[in-house]
Swiss-Prot record:
Topology versus the membrane: Multi-pass membrane protein
The gene coding this protein: btuB
Binding site for cyanocob(III)alamin: 84, 91, 109-110, 250, 310, 518
Motif (TonB C-terminal box): 598-615
GO molecular function per UniProt: ABC-type vitamin B12 transporter activity; metal ion binding; porin activity
A Pfam short name: Plug
Taxonomic path: Bacteria, Pseudomonadati, Pseudomonadota, Gammaproteobacteria, Enterobacterales
UniProt protein name: Vitamin B12 transporter BtuB
Length: 615
């Protein structure tokens, strides 16, 4: 019989903070790839459910992520525009993005995943862990790991529709049904469109500003089948795909003065299948996946197959075998994962048919000894380009008073060079991985009904890959030093639920001592939720501190300072019946004018009205 929660169906997490479940009875698996009680998780971790997304009425994944501790975001305008996700001051390429535990196939050439392109309709759960995790997951996990779960929590059918500012429209539906006692089927589809707005404020892309609207359209389809062969054995097959078209502001090139490449078309499809075994203290899963993405940039008057168009095309193959066994008051896990990324001839920046292969073997362990909890992980990766690379991490927690813990951790992590840096026009196939060493200390507890956590961390990143304009090639030349403090708390006052977060991040270039671009030094985040006469209210406050960026519209390029801003969102929902719910939201309530990327406008005040029917 299919269980409501399958151990290896999807990686799930919890946290000792207000952005996550804090039940000591919850079981989680993300932190170390094995099942463990939530109160033994030593890394700072957050989880967002589908109910949270609907309460916040978020229309993009980026809007969800910006609310979480340690996260800073930057975007070249509105929905669908290019974006960056910074976790604890690290580069956007230093965050590992997983979908159902599998690496998102979007970073093969550019090196980082753009979450503005991932459809929020696919998201049923987001699980987010901060700090180094390369010893568990391999490359990219320097700043943290974001795992997007697409599996619905329960059976049912949902139809939804919404409209809003800038011509926003959304229509979708999903259903999950159990057939007999052993088979479950899920189907979903979604369509999103917005006319958008003119994103460039002053031509910071190096040319004259385009006075046009920069819209976005997405079409998504999803299907999954799960079957339990016995009480111990089960299997699944799952597939999804999406097509995105985004208009953005570009500039006329001196080489092609009659061509304006200002449209992006992304096609992505993913298929995966797996077999699970769960028998008491031993758990195992064998999983394989295939994904294929084609990312065009072109002049819409000439088409995406014109010689002036560019293409990033990546195929990705994954095989994972994970195992865990309960031992004493803890668990031991071990596994192997294999990945191959390949490009087709003609792919942007990469002129030849190339591929990268990586095989990783890892070991994890957690054990509780009285008031002490110890965990550790070690991993060895064998990469076809740069050979072997090892990482490790360890953490220890001491519950010095009941309900209060001190946690100390240290870990190493790395980021492998991407295909563009290795094999592109300016590539260097002698590049080494970027490497990180991180320390963190934290106190957490429950005081007078307030669940809180305060942590301080330092992250030294060496061998950063940068482009040398004189030599016209990529080299391992950069270094970054990041120091920060993170504090979260959650509590109730009568019918009001409060969640508060504060982030201080000092992220600097170690050679020049300059602050890294687009990272706010301070952020304050506050979430208030309540119910009044069956109306569910959600009020969000976000203070985004001053940041620095580069003005590419000047020569030579100059650093510019972007001022801080206070943003308020208000969302309300009302259950008309037990099946029908209507929702409304005002984002940027006071219509603040600000930028997260210099020279690119944000949306201003926006309104959305939506409804869902569930049966």
């Amino acid at each position: 019989m299919i269980k409501k929660v399958s151990l290896m169906t999807a990686l799930s997490v919890t946290a000792f903070s207000g952005w996550a479940q804090d039940s000591a009875d919850s079981l989680v698996v993300t932190a170390n790839r094995f099942e463990q009680p939530a109160n033994t998780v030593l890394a700072p971790t957050s989880v967002v459910t589908r109910e949270d997304i609907e309460r916040w009425q978020s229309t993009t994944v980026l809007d969800v992520m910006r609310r979480l501790p340690g996260v800073d975001t930057a975007q070249n305008g509105g929905m669908g525009q290019a974006s960056s996700l910074f976790v604890r001051g690290t580069n956007s390429s230093h965050v590992l993005i997983l979908v159902d535990g599998i690496r998102l196939n979007q970073a093969g050439v550019t090196g980082s995943s753009d979450l503005s392109q991932f459809p929020i309709s696919l998201v049923q759960r987001i699980e987010y862990i901060r700090g180094p995790r390369s010893a568990v997951y391999g490359s990219d996990a320097i700043g943290g790991v974001v795992n997007i779960i697409t599996t619905r929590a329960k059976d049912g059918t949902t139809l939804n529709a919404g409209v809003g500012s800038h011509g926003y429209q959304n229509y979708g539906g999903s259903t999950q049904q159990t057939l007999g006692d052993n088979t479950r089927v899920t189907l979903a589809g979604d369509y999103t469109y917005t006319k958008g707005f003119d994103v460039v404020a002053d031509g910071n892309n190096g040319g004259l500003a385009q006075t046009d609207r920069d819209g976005y359209m997405n079409k998504t389809i999803y299907g999954a089948l799960e079957h339990a062969f016995s009480d111990q054995w089960s299997g699944f097959v799952r597939g999804f795909g999406y097509s995105n078209r985004t208009a953005y502001d570009a500039y006329y090139s001196s080489f092609t003065p009659d061509v304006l490449v200002d449209t992006r078309q992304l096609y992505s499809q993913t298929w995966d299948t797996g077999l699970r075994f769960n028998d008491g203290i031993f758990h195992s899963q064998l999983l394989s996946s295939y994904s294929h993405s084609k990312d065009y940039n072109y002049d819409p008057h000439l088409g995406r197959y014109d010689s002036t168009a560019t293409l990033d095309e990546i195929k990705q193959y994954n095989v994972q075998w994970t195992n865990s066994v309960d031992v004493g008051h803890g668990n031991v896990g071990a596994g192997v994962d294999w990945q191959k990324q390949s490009t087709e001839p003609g792919t942007n920046y990469v002129t030849n048919d190339t591929n990268l292969r990586n095989t990783g073997v890892y070991l994890t362990a957690l054990q509780k000894f009285g008031d002490f909890t110890l965990e550790g992980a070690a991993r060895s990766d064998d990469n076809s380009q740069f050979g072997r690379h090892g990482t490790w991490q360890s953490s220890a927690a001491w519950e010095f008073i009941e309900g209060y813990r001190f946690i100390a951790s240290y870990g190493t992590a790395y980021k492998a060079p991407n295909l563009g840096q290795l094999y592109g026009f300016y590539g260097n196939d002698h590049l080494n991985p970027e490497e990180s060493k991180q320390w963190e200390g934290a106190f957490e507890g429950l005081t007078a009904g307030v669940s809180w956590r305060v942590s301080a961390y330092r992250n030294d990143v060496d061998n950063l890959i940068d482009f040398d304009s004189n030599l016209q090639q990529y080299y391992n030349v950069g270094k970054a030093r990041i120091k920060g403090v993170e504090a979260t708390a959650s509590f109730d006052t009568g019918p009001l639920t409060h969640t508060v977060g504060y982030d201080y991040v000092d992220a600097r270039n170690a050679a020049t001592n300059e602050l890294l671009d687009r990272r706010a030094k301070q952020q304050v985040k506050y979430q208030l939720d309540t119910q009044v006469y069956d109306f569910d209210w959600s009020l969000t406050y976000h203070y985004l501190g001053t940041r620095y960026d580069t003005d590419f519209g000047s020569y030579p390029y100059q650093k510019v300072k972007m001022g801080g801003v206070s943003l308020w969102d208000l969302a309300v929902s009302y259950p008309v019946t037990s099946h029908l719910t209507v929702r409304g939201k005002i984002a940027n309530l006071f219509d603040k004018d600000y930028e997260t990327v210099y020279g690119y406008e944000t949306a201003g005040r926006e309104y959305t009205l939506s409804g869902s029917y569930t049966f």
